[in-house]
Structures are given as C-alpha cells and as structure tokens.
Amino acid sequence: MARKEFRYRGYTLEQLMNMSLEELARLFPARQRRSLKRGLTPEQKKLLRKIRLAKKGKYKKPIRTHCRDMIILPEMVGLTIYVHNGKEFVPVEIKPEMIGHYLGEFAPTRKKVEHGAPGVGATRSSMFVAVK
C-alpha cells in the first residue's frame, strides 16, 4: 500500500516551504501563532540562521541548541537538531509531522523513575527476613 502524502491543514510540504512566516503563522494553533506574531527571540534567530546554513551545506557541525521554545518550521524538516534537556543534548530528527510543535516537546526533561528492589527493613515484615 502506498504511503499517504503528508499534508498540514491541507497544504503539502512544498507549499508550506514556499510560504512566508506570516502566512505560515495563520495555519498554526493560537499559542504558536501568538508566539510568531511577537517575533523571534535573538536565540531563535541564531538557530534559524544555523539551520539555513546547514540546509545549504555550509554549516558542518551538528546543530545544538538550548532553545526549546522554537517552533518547528517546514524549513527544518530533514535535519537533526540536538536539543538540551537540562543535562545533555538529545538528538531530534525533524519529520514533517512535527511542524507546528515546539522543539522541547521532543526532548523530555524528566526521566521515568525506575525503582530497585526494596531493602531489608523497608517494611515491617521484612525485618525478620534473613539477610543473604
């Protein structure tokens, strides 16, 4: 079965790539639309500049950023961006389905707790269990 072509609100990826930031903002949900309407922060502009250089092949290093509040735009599709999660940089491969989301959504800041076995004396009944 053929894979269905990606569309965002009825527009193909090529059409989204040709849109200006203002036209694109109209398609996004309210939170992202308001964020783009206020303008990009200097950190976001710097990241966008690196992304554009990487697309042209002029930026060789991996793109690393602390800018978790950057909205994923169509021009980022296909790149791998390393997003900081508070401890390390997590690689995030940008796919078309991620357009309109924030970078931080794909780099979780909290780890799932993995408890070990309870120790001796952890409960009242384990006080009388022989220690190995």
UniProtKB/Swiss-Prot annotation:
One of its GO terms (biological process) is ribosomal small subunit assembly. Signal peptide: none annotated. PANTHER family: RIBOSOMAL PROTEIN S19P FAMILY MEMBER (PTHR11880), SMALL RIBOSOMAL SUBUNIT PROTEIN US19 (PTHR11880:SF2). NCBIfam families: PRK04038.1, uS19_arch. Protein S19 forms a complex with S13 that binds strongly to the 16S ribosomal RNA. The keyword Cytoplasm does not apply. Part of the 30S ribosomal subunit. This is Small ribosomal subunit protein uS19. InterPro entries: Ribosomal_uS19, Ribosomal_uS19_CS, Ribosomal_uS19_euk/arc, Ribosomal_uS19_SF. Belongs to the universal ribosomal protein uS19 family. It comes from Pyrococcus furiosus (strain ATCC 43587 / DSM 3638 / JCM 8422 / Vc1).
